[in-house]
Design a protein with these regions (language model features):
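A short, hydrophobic beta-strand element of the alpha/beta-hydrolase
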Residues: 33-34, 66
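Oxidoreductase cofactor-interface core, primarily capturing Rossmann-like NAD(P)-dependent enzymes
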Residues: 26, 39-152, 164-170
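A general structural signal for well-ordered alpha-helical segments in protein cores
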Residues: 16, 137, 185-189
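Short acidic/polar active-site loop segments enriched in Thr and Asp
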Residues: 29-30
Length: 242
């Protein structure tokens, strides 16, 4: 699914709701849900769909563990080939106004599985990130240049470009439906370009890297080193931004 409204409600809500119904019919006692940390500030349709199912699961009577990971390594792998080819690393604004604590597939899978046996993770919403400090897009680029032995080159994309595109495409989309879909994708892009994938402190109204739980052993920079060494970049699919 791409995150557009139709896909979101079919997959993030309806498919999950049917899976929950089947689980209850089969006598399943514990439902572990892979959600996303971005639902803590829901501005997009797919986030509302995810939240709707989270609430349905909580009310189901089953033991639940709702896991909200920060960011996936493969989502942050898209510019390795650009940098290897001598192209600049693309950033929104100065590349320092957002940050994340990404988690590897292996570490996340281990955390999900352990929810079944760890009673402290039962009937809880569990934000989770990977090990180490939060990393900005600028720091991701700087590390790649260092790893590849290249002079750092960044190209800034104006942060206001995406909401402008979304507004234009949304207006024209009332006449040409396919452009309405592109408008939603622009809104999604702007969200991830302007919001950190960290725990949101509702009282202080800011993201808190220190309060974002960490788990596992593999860092994003470990993965960068492995991918560059093996010349193997993960397939991103709908995780692609650049």
């Amino acid at each position: 699914r791409t995150g557009v409204p139709k896909d979101a409600w079919l997959v993030d809500y309806e498919a999950h709701s049917k899976a929950l119904q089947i689980a209850k019919e089969c006598g399943v006692a514990h439902f572990v849900l892979l959600s996303a940390i971005c639902v803590q500030k829901p501005l997009l349709e797919f986030q509302h769909a995810k939240l709707a199912f989270e609430q349905e699961l909580i009310a189901s009577g089953l033991t639940y563990s709702i896991v909200r990971p920060t960011a996936f390594f493969k989502s942050l792998s898209g510019q390795i080939q650009r940098v290897k080819a001598g192209k600049p690393f693309l950033i929104f604004g100065d590349g320092k106004h957002t940050a994340c604590k990404p988690i590897s597939d292996h570490d996340l899978g281990d955390f999900l599985a352990s929810c079944l046996e760890d009673a402290s993770r039962h009937n809880r919403i569990l934000p989770i990130g990977g090990p180490g400090p939060a990393i900005t897009p600028y720091e991701q680029g700087a590390y790649l240049f260092q790893l590849l032995g290249k002079t750092p080159r960044f190209k800034s994309v104006p942060l206001g470009m995406l909401p402008f595109l979304a507004k234009v495409l949304g207006g024209v989309g009332k006449i040409i439906p396919s452009l309405a879909t592109k408008a939603e994708l622009a809104r999604i892009g702007h969200y991830y370009a302007s919001e950190s994938m960290l725990l949101w402190d509702f009282e202080k109204q800011r993201y808190d890297a220190d309060a974002t739980p960490s788990y596992g052993s593999q860092t994003l920079f470990d993965a960068y080193k492995q991918w560059v060494k093996e010349e193997s970049i993960p397939e991103r699919g709908d995780h692609a931004v650049f």
